[in-house]
Structure formats: structure tokens, C-alpha cells
Amino acid sequence: MLQRFLSLILCILLACPSYTQTIQDTPNTDLRRFFTQAGATYLIKYPHQTGTTITLPPNVTLQFQGGSIAGKLVFNNTQLNGNVKLQGSSISGTLKNKTFNAKWLCYADGKKDDATNINAILAMCNEVLFPKGTYLLESMHKPPYKINKPYHIGIHRSNIKITGEKGAILKTKTKAGTLCIYSKPKDIPHSIHDITIEGMTFMVQNESTEWDPYQEHCHTVSLIGVNRCTIEKCTFRNFWGDAICLNHYGDNTSTGERARNMNVVIRNNQINGYKCCNRNGISIINGQNVIIEKNQLTHTSHSSMPGAIDIEANDKAYTVDNIQIRENRIDHSQGKNGAISVISNKEGAPAHHIEITNNKITNSRRAFRFYVWTDYAASHITVKDNWVDKNTDPWVWDGKGRTQNWVFTGNTFLRKTNKKFGQDVRFEGLTYKNNRLK
């Protein structure tokens, strides 16, 4: 019988008894005779191995404190196995539709590495709650598929919810990504799905004020081929590349599109780059049906990088379609393109059905940049009811491509632009009205 390490702390608390008996193991404990008392707490301080499947009594609490069990446990006809070491902070979750509370070896002290155990938790649990504490991430996730940069944490299965209590911080120091959520390449119909990240704080200890090209692709949260994902009420403090990147596998015309991000909501997040020594706040390189709303983005983007929100596919193999950017507050975006940019490059990268509405942009290098180089690669772009302060240059249009069906209405600018509207872009179907210069 193939055995997997069960080194997780499993507190299965379906009913709390008024009195809890605590039973501790010894180096010679026979597990077949150890678990007999319903409602008891069992302390596992020594390593054990058994070829017998152990059935747990009801309402027990297992606390692994340096010990482990190599074997299989069964509770309420549900088999529990895994490979997590333990002791430390509480995390709750579900496993095969059974609800439990667990104490894992997550030190949450900001000094000792928690990445290995968090990866193991996410391999087992569908719902994970991080209590208040600083979870230092040093070790790396080992992905089954090649991704462009190393990440500390990886998720490559569906139906995962991560929730952070106030003060729950995932902290990194190394030039690596924090969290990558990714599907198997070349299998878009079976992409992983239904991922929620809520209330977490992501902090990168980036002390640099000099731009290092390597860090451009070290994103805090990266999605590669994810369907139905929500990231909300999170805080991103400092970051190397992007705070959030809707990413890809480096696809091109020869490989075809190997992964696509679909039905993504990024809402009510606080994104602060601190020293403007990062790439973008949010990048959409590959995305379909994406909503970015009510986020606050400040101090994002090195002067050589695009800006706070960048919609920019790299190749015509990607999909960028039905993107809604609305009611965001952007301040001190110092990227070369603008606070919000839509780029369709010489390779014919697509940008279709994009709505940029009701955003407020202040103290930034530029509000908007639209770059259309290839005929009809970009179409149906709406820029409506945005407000731009006097410290921010309004726009740049660039490129020589033909583009269709633009609406530019109801925007308020407190400063003139020195750029000719549209530059050399050739519009086929443009509505330009009710824009105000105060």
C-alpha cells in the first residue's frame, strides 16, 4: 500500500465537549491502540509509521508537535493523508467536503520560513484562513510545468479560497514571485477554476531604488490560465514586477495560445509600489472578461515601465477581450505610458472591447496612452467619464494602425495636452464629445 506522509495538524472539531482529555504519544506508541477516546486531544511528538489504516474516534483534535504519522487516517469515512509538518498558527479549511480546523507549522513570526508548509496546506485544503501574523516566504514552489520565473507559492488545482484575517501578511525578500496560480499548458477547456483570494496582505521587502531588468517578471500574484478568479480586499505593499499579472506561458504564433485567463475580478484592493521601482500595478497580458474596479493604486512603475494598469498582449497568439476598468483611484503613476495604457504592438497583439470609465487619476506622468500599430488589432475602445488632475498630462496616441469604433466622451482634464489627438492612428468610427478642459 502506497503511503504518504501525514504531517498535518488536524483539529476536527465538529462538536466541542465540555472537558477535553489530552493524551500524549511516546516513542513506542502503537497507533492501533492509541486513538480510543472520543473528544480527546492527541499530542503527536514522535515519528510513527504504520501499514494499518487508523480510524479516528469522533470529535478528536490531533496536534502534531514535531512528530509525524506515515500512514493513513480515516475520520467519518473520509481518508486523510498529506505531507505537512506542524505546530504553530491556526488555519481552517475543508478537505474532501469535511470541515476542520488545523494547527500547521506556520510560525507567522516573520523570521522563519513558512513557504513549504503553506504550499503543502494549499495542496490539501480547499479553504484556508490565515490568522494575523507575518508569514515569511523563502523556499520555492516546485511547479510540474515550466513557468517563466520562480515563485514561493503555487496553486494548480481548482476550487481554492484563501482568506486573510486583518494583519495576515505574506512577506518575501528574494527576487521571486510570491504566488502563481496556473493551469496545465495546452488545455484551455480544462483550466483550473474558481479561485478566491481575499483580505491578504502581500509585502515585498524591496529596498532598491535602482531598476533591475530581472525583477520585471517577478510578480506578486500571477495568473496563468485561470477561469473564474476573484482577488479582492487585498493589500499589496511594494513589489518587484507587477502586483497582479494576468500572465502567460510565453506563447507565440508557433506555439499558439496555451493558456487563457477568463472571468477575472480584481476589486477593492490597495496597491502601493512605494518608491515607483516596479513594473505595473496590474497587467493584462492575456485576459478575457476581466473587471478591474474600485482599486487604489499609488506610487507604481519605474519611469522605464508602462504604468499603473497596463493592457498589453505581447503577441497575436494571446487574447485580450472584454476588459472593464472602472472607478479606480490612481495616484503617482510614474510609468512612461500612463496611468492606464492600451498597447497593440507591431506583432498584432489584440485589444478589443475595452471600457475605461469613471477613474480618477492624479499626480501622474500621464493619464492614458493608446498605441495601435497593426491594422484592426485594436477595436471597440471606450474612454468615458474619467477625471484627470492638473498635474497629469492627459494622453498620448501613437502608432500607424487602423482602428475601429472608439468612444471618447465625458472626460474631465484640468490641463491641456501638447499631443495631437490620435497622432498618426487612423480611426474608423470615432465618437469624441463632451470632454471638458477646466
Feature annotation, model-predicted:
Residues T94-L105:
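Short domain-boundary/entry signatures in modular proteins, especially
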Residues Q49-T61, I69-Q87, I118-C125, L136-T163, ...:
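Extracellular beta-strand-rich solenoid/capping regions of secreted or surface-exposed proteins
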Residues M1-T22:
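Bacterial Sec-dependent N-terminal signal peptides
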Residues Q21-K45, K103-P131, L137:
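Acidic Gly/Asp/Thr-rich repetitive segments characteristic of extracellular carbohydrate-active
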Residues Q37-G39, P57-N59, F75, C125, ...:
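Parallel beta-helix/beta-solenoid
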Residues A70-V74, S139-M140, K171-G177, N206-D212, ...:
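Short glycine/acidic-rich loop motifs that flank beta-strands on beta-rich extracellular proteins
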Residues I69-S92, T403-K438:
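Leucine-rich solenoid repeat scaffolds
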